[in-house]
């Protein structure tokens, strides 16, 4: 696949639940204000997308307990954003100041709970089709489905060996599945010790081991039609002895501008 100058360096991954009774209000606040004012207008952030997991999708998550989401069905909404390569710190400096300003000016939303929010750095991307939708465009392509996977290396397994084993032994089966477009792997971006104190609210779990790999799988179909492949992926990982799968979750793309799914969480 041809490369172009606009390249992803990092991702903001934020998985959140509206508090009961505030589902519509949260959805409207986020997509009509915070999606833009808290993220998209910031420097070097060039794409964003929102995803939702109604109850039938939450029921497909595995394993039953996860250090990434506690409980495993936490996180009804997921937002993912691309930050340009070599400019993540510039964006994060702006974002820290911006969220303080927004809350100080009455533009926060306290009736929500973070399941897991963090910054991740891109380390690998693989495609089902050599001329498929580039990862840089995958949020703007509006895929109908997204799968999130998290794996942790076994004791003594290096980050490089963990990634290489997945790419060789587990990823090909996913990419051979009809509807799956691309797979990407991300490592946790180093965070300042006072990161939590800079946020107006707790940011959810620590995600598990520091050396985990968060993986995004963009799906050109209803994600439930591909979920057997995700289960097979998990079995391959857990049986391989090199890593363990700690979280697998499907999402639909949100129907922007509507209250769809707010009554199904």
Locations of the language-model features?
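Macromolecular interaction modules
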Residues: 1-265
